[in-house]
């Protein structure tokens, strides 16, 4: 999903016993963008079923460091990250919502939503 200067994309891949999510944040601006994080958590990922019931949340039962961190993306640079849902739910249509937790000056929070099929 676009956010003027950065684009967040999601690719959901069904594997035999899990769903893998590959995500990519691309700086499409002409300048470097510095993101600040207040914890070690770089993103949140939530999967919903067709009734909008939450089925998976990346941060559930995880602990993150409480340390400030920075990430600088140069113009044209991409930051790739991933997560694995160690379950294959029943067949159907699901929605994944990813929120990039980094904050940058003059940018809204970066999010993307995408539907995917489980067969």
Swiss-Prot record:
Record localization: Cytoplasm
Lineage: Bacteria, Bacillati, Bacillota, Bacilli, Bacillales
This protein's GO CC annotations: cytoplasm
InterPro entries: Intracell_prot_inh_BsuPI, IPI
Main function: Directly regulates the major intracellular proteinase (ISP-1) activity in vivo. Inhibits ISP-1 in the early stages of sporulation. It may be then inactivated by a membrane-bound proteinase.
Gene this chain is encoded by: ipi
Main location: cytoplasm
Source species of the chain: Bacillus subtilis (strain 168)
Keyword annotations of the record: Cytoplasm, Protease inhibitor, Serine protease inhibitor
Protein name: Intracellular proteinase inhibitor
Single GO MF descriptor: serine-type endopeptidase inhibitor activity
Pfam hit, one: BsuPI
């Amino acid at each position: 999903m676009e956010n003027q200067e950065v684009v967040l994309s999601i690719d959901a891949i069904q594997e035999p016993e899990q769903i893998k999510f590959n995500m990519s944040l691309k700086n499409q601006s002409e300048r470097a963008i510095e993101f600040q994080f207040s914890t070690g958590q770089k993103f949140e990922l939530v999967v919903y079923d067709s009734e909008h019931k939450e089925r998976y949340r990346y941060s559930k039962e995880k602990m993150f460091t409480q340390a400030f961190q920075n990430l600088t993306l140069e113009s044209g640079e991409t930051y790739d990250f991933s997560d694995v849902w160690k379950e294959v739910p029943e067949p159907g249509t699901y929605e994944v919502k990813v929120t990039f937790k980094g904050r940058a000056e003059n940018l809204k929070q970066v999010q993307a939503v995408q539907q995917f099929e489980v067969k």
